[in-house]
Amino acid sequence: MGHQSSWMKQTVIDSVVQSSKVGVFSMFSMDYKAPRKYSHGRNFGVARQQDFAADIVTRRPYAPYDNGMKKGPNKLSRNLVWTSKEYKSPEGNRPRQNAANGSAKPQVIGTGHRVSNQPRKNAVYGPRSSSLSDTRGCGPRLNGSPKKSVCNFWKDGNCKKGEKCQFLHSWSCFPGLAMVAALEGHKNDIKGIALPQGSDKLFSVSGDGTLLIWDCNSGQCVRSINLQAEAGSLISEGPWVFLGLPNAVKAFNVQNSKDVHLEGVVGQVHAMTAANGMLFAGTSSGSILVWKATDSESDPFKYLTSLEGHHSGEVTCFVVGGEVLYSGSVDKTIKVWDLNTLQCRMTLKQHIGTVTSLLCWDKCLISSSLDGTIKLWACSENESLKVVQTRKQELSVHTLCGMHDAEAKPIMFCSYQNGAVGIFDLPSFEERGKMFSTQTICTLTIGPGGLLFSGDKSGNLRVWSLASGTKV
């Protein structure tokens, strides 16, 4: 694939252990039937290396970013939770070459197709000799006001105004951030993206009922699996990949090809996370189901309980900070759970719309909602959480994630309804730039080596690179 697929080789393969050559996801050629329609949901997690499910039992839970450390998260925890088989052939959608104005279309990596490695001179990639931080076309307008939207003519590769255009000629407007690949195959909103440890495969699942497995060496889709049901969520934890389905959670180990059906699920699973040796799954009914990892190879996950005092509506998101699990819901509340006792400590009720995403940073909780607000919560003297800052957006907010920039400063990505993603400094909430998509981005996942994966409601899966970026 030439230099266009180098993101796979240079960053992922350097950071992810090569897997043994095992069969991939045999579990999903399953005799599984489910109701056709369920409402959408989303969430994702990030993996840590483990040999067996029993290893999850002994590891420490996620923890928020600690300002007392030099760079990055608590090294003893895995604080990375910031918190149809018809495919379009790229042969008929090849990017136009326009040296003056650039092309909006990045390399399209499809299922079983290869795209010729043509010279690129555009605002997405820049010339061959340029770095991935090219943001040409992101400068100010002639009157000094910033450009706030992408040029529709540039998207089609035929804007004649060049640098004088009042609209952006780039998919991103942030120093060092560039889109490096577009993976094509999904036809509906992407519910989860996972890059499990011990594997050289990227997993993505969509509301179109397909699970796609991508090879990190070539960037090609190596397998498409018809789930025969609408998926609700996808996460990875260690070598395990977990898939939330109607009335089911499926688990697959990429190291030994073991697949497991987790019992006890009633309703569509919209959100999952793992911490303290346990897997948590939030359903459409508002219940939160818990499985405990065991040292049994035949039964690696044992159903433990359903958390009492659960939400009155669909659980949409999770995040873990220290010894606490936070859950958000369409009932507009955030519940705070003790990971040791599995009891609800408190319920937060400041949002007036669905809580869409949760993020732990420093000793604070950050939440977003369809009400268009981002709230920063901090502990008060009586150990309750109170809102200390609210940022009001013009549009509904759909997902949050965080990482460090090239200067090791924490930044937050915030997805809006119009397809834009705001990039903010923490803790000031000052907006530093944006990245863009054609539809609302509903999934953001941080990868190794400064990679960021985004999935939108039209099925576009894009790979971004932030120069010298690290996970928060």
Curated annotation (Swiss-Prot):
WD repeat spans: 185-226, 261-301, 310-347, 350-387, 436-472
Region described as Disordered: spans on this chain: 87-139
SUPFAM superfamilies per record: CCCH zinc finger, WD40 repeat-like
Positions of C3H1-type zinc fingers: 145-172
SMART domains per the UniProt record, alphabetical: WD40, ZnF_C3H1
Keywords assigned by UniProt, alphabetized: DNA-binding, Metal-binding, Repeat, WD repeat, Zinc, Zinc-finger
GO molecular function: DNA binding; zinc ion binding
Matching Pfam families: WD40, zf-CCCH
Gene3D superfamilies with a match to the protein in the record: YVTN repeat-like/Quinoprotein amine dehydrogenase
One of the record's GO cellular component terms: nucleus
Official protein name in the record: Zinc finger CCCH domain-containing protein 59
Designated gene of the protein: ZFWD3
